[in-house]
Regions:
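Gly/Ala-rich beta-loop-alpha elbow adjacent to hydrolase catalytic centers
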Residues: 103-113
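Alpha/beta-hydrolase active-site loop
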Residues: 50-55, 73-96
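Short, surface-exposed "cap/lid" segments of acyl-processing enzymes
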Residues: 21-58
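The feature captures the conserved acid-bearing segment of alpha/beta-hydrolase catalytic domains
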Residues: 126-190
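Conserved hydrolase catalytic core segment
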Residues: 115-125
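Bacterial Sec-dependent N-terminal signal peptides
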Residues: 1-23
Length: 193
């Protein structure tokens, strides 16, 4: 299922203001774990092909400058987040407004995005976490501390994505805006493909 249109609509219609089209807006898109160890054209045995290129293209067609790469190997989420933060800091140092920067992650990419939120500790950045929270995360990954404007999206039938309200309530950083969307597609974790 192509989630790019859904993300674009949600992005503009929920917690983030879409400003003047002449202003540069940046998206860091962080894909799921499957693509770390498989080629872009390989089919997931249960969910089919990941529409990575289509998602990037949709964001670009909507006027965003997209920063994304296909990760290779089983990368460490925290370490990769530090690399993303370096890029974000560079954009800000060159005049980009933090509120025009959004980090979007699906599944493992969502966990990387959560680390970016934590380690960047910038309440003006925007984040969309998709299918990337389990109830055990509070105990298993206690260092995550949401910071920024947060939108979470999860599928009701997906065991790898549930409500993040508990994480939000346990976070100590300022969260200006928080919205959560529960989908009911019946596709489980496959809705991110």
């Amino acid at each position: 299922m192509k989630i790019s249109l859904l993300i674009g609509i949600l992005f503009c219609s929920t917690i983030f203001a879409c400003g003047n089209k002449n202003e540069e807006r940046f998206i860091f898109f962080l894909h799921n774990r499957f693509l770390e160890t498989h080629e872009l054209n390989e089919l997931h045995p249960e969910f089919g092909r990941t529409e990575y290129r289509e998602i990037i293209k949709e964001f670009e067609n909507s006027g965003f400058k997209v920063i994304s790469e296909k990760r290779n190997g089983n990368v460490n989420a925290r370490n990769y987040a530090l690399e993303v933060i370096e890029q974000i800091d560079s954009l800000i140092n060159h005049g980009a407004e933090p509120n025009k920067i959004t980090v979007i992650g699906t599944s493992k990419g969502g966990y990387i995005a959560q680390y970016v939120s934590t380690l960047a500790n910038n309440p003006n950045l925007n984040f969309i976490f998709i299918a990337s929270y389990r109830n055990s995360d509070i105990q298993n990954i206690p260092e995550i501390n949401y910071c920024g404007n947060i939108l979470t999206i999860y599928e009701k039938t997906d065991p790898f994505g549930v409500s993040t309200v508990e994480r939000k309530e346990n976070s100590t950083c300022k969260i200006k805006n928080f919205k959560e969307i529960e989908l009911n597609t019946g596709m489980g974790h496959g809705f991110i493909f």
